[in-house]
């Protein structure tokens, strides 16, 4: 049996205290413009076809599926800051639509499941959540901090920059992103799984005293204690809504082989699931992102393994339990 296969005995609906009912909106985000490798835009359809809607209906949710095929369409020409960052107008156009879609579904009291796509999409998901829940905290699960500014980014790929927009570090804003704004403070952000940082990211994390738990901390304290520390830091007393943003490259390449920026020494499958279980048990989840699945960066079995991991992240975050 696949380690990600759902069992009929593992049903549990986990409602958020911030929602009125059992609605879940899956927003497919077929987009790979924030980085140079084709394939991430294929992930939402593959995750859907693998059975994500059935998974969540099986848990007892009222599921709404939102397709966004237009996200694959690039603008006819790029913006004025193409030399500063790659595909700025394309990323801006899509993430602005993402913001609006996330906000719209949350306003209807539905938990939002965002399936990417590359992690630049979080420029929109974070701002969309904050538009409805302006005290929401962000638990960022990733091998990378994604906190570079366009100026500090060595690669100029915007999937490494989303949090610099959310935190206001990208100011003065490039013309293409004039619509963005600082929406979170450092005290409402925590990282788990970090193991590959650029110099400026390391400086930001240290100087701004951001809660950043690397794989060293996971090894030293265990995932249970790390999650406890992270959640207590960003959400003391469980009073705030939680936005879980999960880049599958946080997991070890054995667990998530089909992704674009693999780094050895990542989370095990069980460690990843424990994070999701803890968020579900808190009763505070309002949105979950699953990003950077790239089916083209592996053989058929590796693509399936990574797609099934994405499904497991969503199911477990929304309450699937063993007992």
Swiss-Prot record:
Biological process (GO), any one: arginine catabolic process to proline via ornithine
Cofactor(s), names only, from the UniProt record: Mn(2+)
UniProt keyword Manganese, yes or no: yes
Assembly description: Homotrimer.
Reaction(s) catalysed by this chain's protein: L-arginine + H2O = urea + L-ornithine
Residues binding Mn(2+) 2: 142, 144, 247, 249
Similarity field: Belongs to the arginase family.
Top EC class for this record: hydrolase
EC number of this enzyme: 3.5.3.1
PANTHER family, alphabetized: ARGINASE
Amino-acid positions noted as binding substrate in the UniProt annotation, renumbered to this chain: 144-148, 155-157, 198, 261, 292
Domain of life: Eukaryota
Name assigned to this protein: Arginase
GO MF annotation, one: manganese ion binding
GO CC, any one term: nucleus
Binding locations of Mn(2+) 1: 119, 142, 146, 247
Encoding gene (name): aru1
Cofactor info, note text: Binds 2 manganese ions per subunit.
Keywords, sorted A to Z: Arginine metabolism, Hydrolase, Manganese, Metal-binding, Urea cycle
This protein's pathway: Nitrogen metabolism; urea cycle; L-ornithine and urea from L-arginine: step 1/1
